[in-house]
């Protein structure tokens, strides 16, 4: 879907937006920020592959709602770290939603410069409380010294790798929320070979075969 998409495509996206906001309601102010974010994403998508092209007609239900649902699993969390933010899901979406919470902050970690540039522009355009870190994940989490309530990742890596990335932050008191797909059981089995974890599984509100893996404690197996 290009910025000059047809009326039919625009109508399809509008219908998808309505379905998403019924699923994960937001304030009028947050909706306006998300509108600006989606417009920017569609503009950049023409030159930078930020999301799978096949998902463009369903940006709101497939990506926005999928991201927003994390807030219900950590309602008191104000300081978030999103690993491998890419096109901004869930990091930018969370920042848009948390803009009305005084003092809230979302840190977006991205190692690819072009995507980090997009994320910075998205934070600027939406006026959301976010900071973009152009860095390898391992480099930044090991040195993290600030407060973190929740660490997230979506479409980034197998679960056992995500657990390893998140370990330093979880040991500082963060809760990990990872968006995973239909292979979650196999990924959990693989993860227990390397880590002692007590994950809680939440089915995705967006349907399909999506899951959210919540982890509060991580210990490396010897």
UniProtKB/Swiss-Prot annotation:
It catalyses: guanosine(527) in 16S rRNA + S-adenosyl-L-methionine = N(7)-methylguanosine(527) in 16S rRNA + S-adenosyl-L-homocysteine. S-adenosyl-L-methionine binds at residues 84, 89, 141-142, 154. Signal peptide: none annotated. This is Ribosomal RNA small subunit methyltransferase G. NCBIfam families: rsmG_gidB. Its EC number is 2.1.1.170. Belongs to the methyltransferase superfamily. RNA methyltransferase RsmG family. It is found in: Cytoplasm. It comes from the Bacteria. InterPro entries: rRNA_ssu_MeTfrase_G (IPR003682), SAM-dependent_MTases_sf (IPR029063). Specifically methylates the N7 position of guanine in position 527 of 16S rRNA. PANTHER family: S-ADENOSYL-L-METHIONINE-DEPENDENT METHYLTRANSFERASES SUPERFAMILY PROTEIN. Keywords: Cytoplasm, Methyltransferase, rRNA processing, S-adenosyl-L-methionine, Transferase. It is an enzyme of class 2 (transferase). One of its GO terms (molecular function) is rRNA (guanine-N7-)-methyltransferase activity. GO terms for cellular component: cytosol. The keyword Magnesium does not apply. Pfam families: GidB.
């Amino acid at each position: 879907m290009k910025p000059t998409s047809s009326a039919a495509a625009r109508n399809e996206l509008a219908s998808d937006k309505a379905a998403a906001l019924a699923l994960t309601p937001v304030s009028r102010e947050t909706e306006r920020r998300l509108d600006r974010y989606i417009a920017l994403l569609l503009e950049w998508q023409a030159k930078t592959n930020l999301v799978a092209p096949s998902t463009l007609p369903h940006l709101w239900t497939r990506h926005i709602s999928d991201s927003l649902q994390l807030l219900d699993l950590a309602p008191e969390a104000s300081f978030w770290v999103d690993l491998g933010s890419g096109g901004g899901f869930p990091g930018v979406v969370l920042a848009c939603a948390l803009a009305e919470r005084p003092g809230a902050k979302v840190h977006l970690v991205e190692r690819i410069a072009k995507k980090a540039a997009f994320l910075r522009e998205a934070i600027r355009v939406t006026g959301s409380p976010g900071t973009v870190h152009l860095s390898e994940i391992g480099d930044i989490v090991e040195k993290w010294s600030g407060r973190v309530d929740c660490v997230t990742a979506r479409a980034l890596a197998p679960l056992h790798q995500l657990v390893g990335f998140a370990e330093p932050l979880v040991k500082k008191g963060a809760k990990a929320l990872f968006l995973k797909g239909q292979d979650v059981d196999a990924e959990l089995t693989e993860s227990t070979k390397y880590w002692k974890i007590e994950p809680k599984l939440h089915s995705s509100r967006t349907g399909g075969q999506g899951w959210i893996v919540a982890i509060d404690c991580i210990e490396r197996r010897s």
